[in-house]
């Protein structure tokens, strides 16, 4: 019985860490709030973009710390800064996709703690 309890205690933290990573990873997908804000704004400016084929990838994610203490929010836990790249192709595929870099503060509980900051890094626009 003691072995079973010990095994359960060792497995539970792994499950919690796994679900935290999955929740944070969701914040980097095209379905996330930050990506949708960027995709919606880009589509409003240019209706030739194919918003359904947009892609998003994680560039960087860091825990927020002050000194050596993690910065946490009572309701949402550990806070992170996250930067993602969002690529939105054109419907006709004759032009290169529009590419954005977007950054926001997130937690495993909430992908929309701050307004997303983003800018266009499409090579022809630089």
Task: State where each predicted segment sits.
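Positively charged n-region of N-terminal signal peptides that target proteins for export
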Residues: 1-4
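Short amphipathic alpha-helical "recognition" segments used for binding
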Residues: 6-7, 76
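N-terminal trafficking/processing presequences and adjacent post-cleavage segments
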Residues: 7-8, 13-60
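Short linear sequence motifs
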Residues: 10, 26, 73, 93, ...
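Charged, low-complexity, helix/coiled-coil-prone segments
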Residues: 25-29, 84, 113-119
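Mature extracytoplasmic domains of secretory-pathway proteins
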Residues: 39-95
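A short, surface-exposed interaction/processing loop segment used at functional sites
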Residues: 101-126
């Amino acid at each position: 019985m003691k072995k079973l309890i010990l095994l359960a205690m060792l497995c539970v933290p792994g499950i919690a860490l796994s679900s935290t990573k999955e929740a944070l990873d969701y914040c980097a997908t095209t379905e996330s709030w930050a990506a949708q804000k960027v995709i919606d704004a880009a589509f409003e400016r240019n209706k030739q973009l194919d918003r359904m084929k947009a892609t998003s990838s994680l560039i960087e994610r860091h825990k927020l710390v002050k000194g050596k203490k993690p910065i946490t929010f009572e309701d949402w836990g550990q806070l992170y800064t996250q930067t993602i790249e969002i690529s939105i192709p054109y419907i006709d595929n004759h032009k290169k996709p529009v590419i954005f870099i977007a950054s926001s503060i997130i937690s495993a509980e909430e992908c929309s703690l701050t307004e997303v900051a983003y800018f266009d890094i499409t090579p022809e626009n630089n």
